[in-house]
């Protein structure tokens, strides 16, 4: 069974015509309506995190669709090693300001135009809901972060938010913003803003 982002169901035989090649694709039956397919596992992950993401985003003034896209990208729909072993669905590193548990994992980072694989410590949580709450607090957790992420937190639309997030240095991937926008548009996550 394959689910669409608006909760409509597409029959499995229809979905098999164009199996999800990457994070998600449309088939000829859903392309006309603009709906994008989610697998059952993706929908279960999405439904699990959505209420908490909405609550945190509203409380902290973060654009909801950006948070949702980041969970999809950073955790591979909750299936990444970091997500399954440390409940970290945003890829937040454990720097010197972090007092909690950490989890070390190999990750790809871009520096000086080159992609390298490095070992990094990431924050570890008891639940993914702790990860969501911590993400909401992260951007104002130090005076430096409050200043650095101010434009991100002031953004009222997802395009501005991801642009400001990229400019702040949140991720080393030079096309991080493009990836987030692609997910937001592909899954119509902007409907939650």
Question: Regions from the language model: what does each represent?
Answer:
Residues 1-193:
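Catalytic cores of secreted/periplasmic lytic hydrolases that degrade extracellular macromolecules
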């Amino acid at each position: 069974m394959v689910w669409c982002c608006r909760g409509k169901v597409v029959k499995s035989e229809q979905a098999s015509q164009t199996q999800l090649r990457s994070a998600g694709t449309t088939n000829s039956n859903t392309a006309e309506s603009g709906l994008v397919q989610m697998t059952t596992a993706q929908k279960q992950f999405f439904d699990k995190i959505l209420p908490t993401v909405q609550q945190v985003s509203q409380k902290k003034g973060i654009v909801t669709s950006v948070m949702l896209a980041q969970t999809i990208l950073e955790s591979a729909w909750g299936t990444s090693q970091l997500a399954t072993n440390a409940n970290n669905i945003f890829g937040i590193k454990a720097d010197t300001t972090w007092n909690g548990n950490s989890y070390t994992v190999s990750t790809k980072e871009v520096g000086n135009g080159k992609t390298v694989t490095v070992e990094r410590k990431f924050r570890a949580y008891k639940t993914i809901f702790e990860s969501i709450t911590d993400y909401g607090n992260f951007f104002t957790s130090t005076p430096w972060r409050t200043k650095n992420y101010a434009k991100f937190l002031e953004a009222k639309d997802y395009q501005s938010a991801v642009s400001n997030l990229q400019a702040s240095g949140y991720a080393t991937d030079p096309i991080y913003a493009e990836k987030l926008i692609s997910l937001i548009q592909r899954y119509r996550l902007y409907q939650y803003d």
